[in-house]
A protein has these predicted regions:
Chain A
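The feature captures the beta-strand-to-loop junction immediately N-terminal to the Walker
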Residues: 104-106
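Helix-to-loop junction immediately C-terminal to a conserved catalytic motif
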Residues: 119
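Q-loop/switch helix immediately C-terminal to the Walker
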Residues: 146-161, 171
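Conserved ABC ATPase "signature" region
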Residues: 155, 167-185
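Conserved ABC ATPase signature
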Residues: 189-196
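Catalytic Walker B motif of ABC-type/P-loop ATPase nucleotide-binding domains
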Residues: 214-218
Length: 270, 229, 107
């Protein structure tokens, strides 16, 4: 790998993690010039070095973030049984504006069920959900129409939210670009998209129309590593914009940056 | 109204991309027509309208089944349930009329003078009216397309095999095609056939529309455990 | 070699402070000082993250300087905290090494 290629890749990786690349790339460039070494020998792969830089820069103490005002989503005492099996037993969940809640738990612990109940797609056996604003939902898969193009999806969902055609297309396309999907406007019918790309569409449709509460059920299925990082960057971005977000996730790397973790594994403290 | 139109537009786009369905829609009724063309021509009229009814209701079945995946999301996005199924019906009715027109012209030219043209037009219009609600009703009640297709196949087969004189035959959705058809092809037939046919078609339409409305509204209902702050 | 890498991992940041005690410097030159001191080649991938950590902890202070020839370089120097840390950690290290030597001595 040439030094220029390596430095360009490093720059991209740092940018993806919202780190200004100028300093680290400048220093690395100077080091390579002085020493004349192969960049992979001196620094390792660009992605790994970027991680090391981030680790060096990251503030170790988490920001204390108190809940602000009334929760946008308050679920109380949610219980759901399927036959004899109790999937959810009196679960409570509160999410405020500008807060990210990660919902974790083993397979079958009811994460998707809980999210669907909060979205209003499923009725619990008991319990109540109070919503303070519009809701957007992104299921693990599905939620798209095989024979429509992404643009057509944007218009369709946008119209429901009262967003005009051109505006809906523009918003959908810009969200696609933020998820590293620049040629969404030129894409054909969604049945021809790869699984990961289709999930990007799914995520965008959940967010279209700027709902106040976002319920995301492992929406990153099939995302490559870069897009996965882009997705979380978007989540922090939406949090800063005051959205209340619930993300169901198996993957634990981002947990130190979310505000609250709700563990649905039976027996764990809530 | 605007939202319903957007649903209709997208449903039309979807159907137009399903090449297989479109070819079937276009050509299957033709096969039905010519299957009886040699013998009594009046059978051709009945069979072609059954062909149109069957393929259009099958197209509606596919459209309804395919929409299940996205409908919950559309509800969350702010559509009312009636906008969803009315939009889809509007698209299917449009497709049906576009399909029926060439067949009307075919019958006009092919059976010129032998049939009452206005009655033929009425049969085709009523068939196009009834078929999509039938297909969507089957889709709403049966989640899987295969079972739905078998139901429609059974209906069409029974429609062809059951003696129309039997009272039981009136339970079948396209019975009115035979009734009005009698008026269309028999010079001696009275206009009361038309009246009975219209009544049957009207009742069938209302029943299937009600099934679609009820089943869809139930499936996509606003749940009682949610309240807005 | 692996053992050596592990030892180095534990004291690299102190060694960097030590190298800077001899005067301010920039990345590549710090690496050369460490190599000249017998620590072997320090990869850039290891050195710069360590410098970033030291900077974040306030033990070194950095500033960019435009050179007479070539592009800007980031220069590092010990802060007062850094100098103090070097002295006290250095003392702890000496005690530690002494104990390790004593245990490892073959009787």
């Amino acid at each position: 790998m040439t030094a220029d290629d390596w430095l360009a890749a490093l720059s991209a990786e740092l940018r993806r993690r919202r780190i200004d690349p100028a300093g680290p790339v400048g220093e690395a460039a100077a080091h390579l010039r002085d020493g004349g070494q192969d960049p992979l020998e001196a620094f390792g792969p660009p992605a790994a070095y970027a991680l090391a830089v981030v680790a060096g820069l990251r503030d170790a103490t988490p920001r204390p973030r108190g809940p602000s005002g009334e929760p946008r989503l308050r679920a109380t005492g949610i219980t759901k049984r399927y036959g004899r099996r109790t999937v959810l037993n009196g679960v409570d969940l509160s999410v405020h504006a500008g807060e990210v809640v990660a919902m974790i738990g083993a397979n079958g612990s009811g994460k998707s069920t809980m999210l669907r109940i909060c979205a209003g797609l499923l009725s619990p056996d008991s319990g109540h959900v109070r919503l303070g604003g519009t809701v957007g939902y992104c299921p693990q898969n599905g939620g798209t129409s095989d024979f429509l193009t992404p643009d057509e999806h944007f218009v369709l969902v946008g119209a429901g939210r009262g967003v005009g055609r051109t505006e809906a297309r523009a918003r959908g396309r810009s969200m696609a670009a933020a998820l590293d999907w620049a040629d969404a406007p030129r894409a054909g019918q969604s049945r021809h998209l790869s699984g990961g790309t289709r999930q990007k569409l799914n995520l965008i449709l959940g967010r279209l129309g700027d709902p106040d509460v976002l319920l995301l059920d492992e929406p990153y299925q099939g995302f490559d590593n870069g897009t996965y990082l882009d997705f979380w960057q978007q989540v922090w971005h939406w949090r800063d914009a005051g959205k209340a977000i619930v993300v169901v996730t198996h993957l634990l790397n981002e947990l130190d940056r979310v505000d609250t973790v709700l563990d649905l594994t039976p027996g764990r403290a809530r | 109204m605007k939202k319903t139109l957007v649903v209709a537009e997208m449903a039309l786009r979807e159907i137009s991309r399903r090449r297989g369905v479109l070819i079937l829609l276009a050509l299957l009724p033709l096969a039905f027509y010519y299957s009886r063309r040699g013998e009594a021509y009046w059978q051709s009229v009945r069979f072609v309208s059954l062909g149109i009814g069957w393929t259009l209701s099958t197209a509606a079945l596919f459209a309804g089944s395919a929409a299940r995946g996205i409908e919950p999301r559309l509800r969350i996005a702010g559509y009312a349930t009636h906008q969803l199924y009315l939009g889809r019906l509007a698209a299917l009715w449009t497709v049906g009329l576009t399909l029926a027109l060439p067949y009307y012209l075919l019958i006009l030219v092919d059976l010129d003078g032998k049939v009452r043209n206005d009655a033929i037009a009425l049969i085709l219009v009523l068939t196009v009216a009834v078929a999509p609600p039938l297909g969507l009703a089957v889709a709403a009640l049966l989640p899987r397309e295969l079972e739905g297709m078998l139901v429609l196949l059974t209906i069409v087969a029974m429609q062809m095999m059951l003696d129309p004189e039997k009272t039981a035959a009136q339970a079948l959705p396209f019975w009115f095609t035979r009734e009005i058809g009698t008026y269309a092809v028999e010079s001696g037939a009275g206009a009361d056939h038309v009246g009975r046919g219209l009544a049957h078609a009207g009742a069938t339409l209302v029943v299937f529309l009600a099934v679609v409305a009820l089943a869809t509204t139930l499936r996509l209902r606003r749940r009682s455990h949610i309240s807005m702050a | 070699m692996d053992r050596r890498t592990q030892w180095l991992r534990g004291v690299l940041d102190l060694c960097v402070l030590g190298a800077l005690a001899r005067g301010e410097s920039y990345g590549y030159e710090i690496a050369q000082r460490l190599e000249a001191g017998g620590l072997g080649v320090i990869a850039g991938g290891t050195l710069y993250p360590a410098l970033l950590r030291l900077e974040r902890l306030g033990l070194v202070v950095a500033d960019w300087r435009t050179g007479a020839s070539g592009p800007a370089r980031k220069y590092y120097r010990l802060s007062d905290d850094g100098a103090a840390t070097l002295r006290s950690a250095g003392a702890d290290w000496a005690v530690f090494v002494g104990n390790v030597n004593a245990i490892m001595e073959v009787p």
